[in-house]
């Protein structure tokens, strides 16, 4: 397994994190973010920015309560919000990425069951959350060039939805390598309304360990929460997993509560989410889509209108 490179870490920080290496493309977090990111306001503001961070292939029970391997994730869940009855849509990865960004279901996501690369048979002309009237970007760690349509090293195109949408305008300029996020966070108005963040295969826990993914999040999420978009109260962040572990046969997971491979953790981080909030409401990736659409004033796509959003449960 290759060691990810550190970007601009100080010598002291590098020594402290050497046991579990991870890549950070972001500037150091501010002291304000380190003090606790949630419950900084009592009234939900008007959110104009939403960030999703997609991790890979671990069930709820793999992550929540696993403080030995995932101390940062569990700490963030206790400081902010945790959906305890949240489900992926299917297996394997790609149907979930397409479903959560388009609202497609059933036969419409079946062409993606093989985790195929974009092609005539493995694509869709359906609308997606990307470019529904809002600004957007997808930030993909280790992607060699914008809107890359093929796997390369630790970049997996199946974890990057935009290249699969044939009618989507802007993929060549808005589906970008992850390093661009640092620049967009630093700018006064450069962070888009909707951001989709995909760590590489090591840091998203697909090929790497839970501990490596946790360390990556611990190095990157605090900088997001220290950005002006978050500290000004306009940004909500959602961390979720594409699917649970061990669920290789294709199945309908959206409302299947009996299968651990359909049950994943989802953490909600926002200034208006009370610390320690949990919700046992049945949510899934369609709920996440509907939540982003509701916050950003976008039309509901497909199955996003069939499931409850997370706004009320997490005081968004």
Short names for language-model regions:
Residues 1-2:
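N-terminal secretory signal peptides that target proteins for export/translocation
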Residues 5-7, 15-37:
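C-terminal region of N-terminal signal peptides and the immediate post-cleavage residues
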Residues 27, 33-316:
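Flexible, surface-exposed loop/gating regions in the mature catalytic domains
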């Amino acid at each position: 397994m290759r060691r990810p490179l550190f970007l601009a870490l100080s010598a002291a920080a590098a020594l402290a994190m050497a046991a579990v290496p991870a890549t950070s493309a972001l500037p150091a977090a501010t002291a304000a973010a380190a003090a606790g990111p949630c419950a900084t306001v009592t009234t939900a503001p008007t959110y104009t920015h939403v960030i999703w961070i997609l991790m890979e292939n671990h069930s709820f029970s793999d992550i929540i309560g696993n403080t030995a391997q995932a101390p940062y994730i569990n700490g963030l869940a206790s400081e902010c919000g945790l959906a305890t009855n949240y489900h992926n849509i299917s297996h394997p990865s790609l149907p979930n990425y397409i479903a959560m960004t388009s609202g497609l279901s059933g036969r419409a996501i079946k062409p993606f069951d093989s985790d195929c690369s974009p092609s005539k048979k493995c694509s869709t002309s359906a609308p997606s959350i990307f470019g529904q009237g809002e600004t957007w970007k997808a930030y993909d760690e280790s992607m060699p060039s914008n809107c890359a349509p093929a796997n390369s090293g630790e970049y997996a195109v199946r974890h990057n939805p935009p290249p699969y949408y044939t009618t989507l305008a802007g993929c060549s300029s808005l589906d970008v390598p992850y390093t661009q996020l640092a620049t967009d966070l630093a700018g006064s108005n450069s962070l888009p309304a909707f951001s989709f963040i995909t760590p590489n295969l090591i840091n998203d826990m697909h090929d790497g360990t839970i501990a490596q993914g946790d360390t990556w999040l611990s190095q990157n999420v605090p900088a997001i929460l220290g950005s002006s978009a978050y500290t000004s109260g306009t940004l909500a962040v959602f961390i979720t997993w594409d699917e649970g572990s061990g669920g290789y046969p294709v199945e309908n997971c959206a409302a299947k509560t009996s299968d651990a491979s359909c049950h994943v953790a989802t953490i909600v981080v926002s200034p208006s989410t009370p610390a320690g909030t949990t919700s046992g409401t049945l949510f899934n990736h369609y709920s996440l889509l509907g939540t982003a659409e509701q916050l950003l004033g976008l039309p509901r796509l497909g199955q996003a209108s069939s499931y409850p959003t997370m706004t009320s449960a997490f005081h968004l």
